[in-house]
Amino acid sequence: MRLRTFLDIDPKLIGVIGGGKRKPTGVVDVALIQSLVRNGEVDDIVAGYGHLVIDECHHLSAVSFERVARRAKARYVLGLSATARKDGHHAIIFMQCGPVRHKVDARAHAAEGMIRHLVRERTTKFELPAVLTTAERPPMPAVYAALAGDDARNDLIFDDVLHAIERKRSPLVLTERKDHLALVADRFSRFVKNVAVLSGGLSAAERKLVESVLAAPESEERLVIATGRYLGEGFDDSRLDTLFLTMPISWKGTLAQYVGRLHRQHAGKTDVLVYDYVDAGVPVLARMAAKRRAGYRALGYSLE
């Protein structure tokens, strides 16, 4: 557990609540907020802590999450978020966590480090199916489905990932659809020795398998494939250095979460690289790509 990296503490004093476990110590406990609420009632244990640290505190606008924060009687409260934004409910964050005390300038942070931040755009030849071209604003779920099923586009991604693995990089393939995740995972499973597939709803046995793959020796090739929703928050693997953004997004906050998976310090890491697949032939996707470019610049990335 990473807490042991920063605290001089007996591991037996670190408790866990959530993920099927309930072993609190009352000293330092790590809990899933969802595990602290049952049938609308907040677990009494919440009131016993003196210091509350809320990761991804932008979720406090959700009713059940705010209930947990309100039930706490902690003297000290710390909220952490990479994606706080004014959404009409943002005042709840400040009510529960207090004012913003510190901001990290992503561009300055990137410039200070010894790790280069690079983006490599890969322009695809993707075109919308005829059935979607008649709509003034084609529905995005249908667009994503068409992207996921485009063989030429998937071939491009597949070749790029294999080349990265050949160059001894540690790649993360990110998609927004479970059917695309399954397709990509099946294809790579025949070519890469260690493949970890991450998505919501994994069984305990599947999670153990993923953990064993993630722990593979650095001398062995390894590929992580995940849905953005799963990896957007809380995932930590310092070995990752290459991101394949296979589905278009536009909001800078989401982009910051995704590329942030690469920013952990790790021995021998000299650069991080994002492969961005730009579908320039589709106006709405081209506009999303333009927003990502602005987002990359704000995050201290350079376009190759």
Task: Locate the predicted segments by residue.
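Conserved helicase ATPase core of P-loop NTP-dependent helicases/translocases
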Residues: 13-25, 41, 172, 182-183, ...
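Conserved helix/coil segment N-terminal to the catalytic DExD/H
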Residues: 18-51, 62-67, 230
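Structural recognition of the conserved hydrophobic beta-strand(s) that form the central parallel beta-sheet
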Residues: 29-32, 75-82, 223-227
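A short beta-strand element within the Helicase C-terminal
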Residues: 47-50, 224-226, 233-248, 257, ...
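Post-DEXD/H (motif II) to motif III coupling segment of the RecA-like Helicase ATP-binding lobe
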Residues: 50-51, 58-121, 296
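Conserved SF2 helicase motif VI
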Residues: 83-84, 250-274, 292-293
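Conserved interdomain hinge at the start of the Helicase C-terminal
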Residues: 135-176, 182-187
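C-terminal helicase lobe
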Residues: 142, 265-304
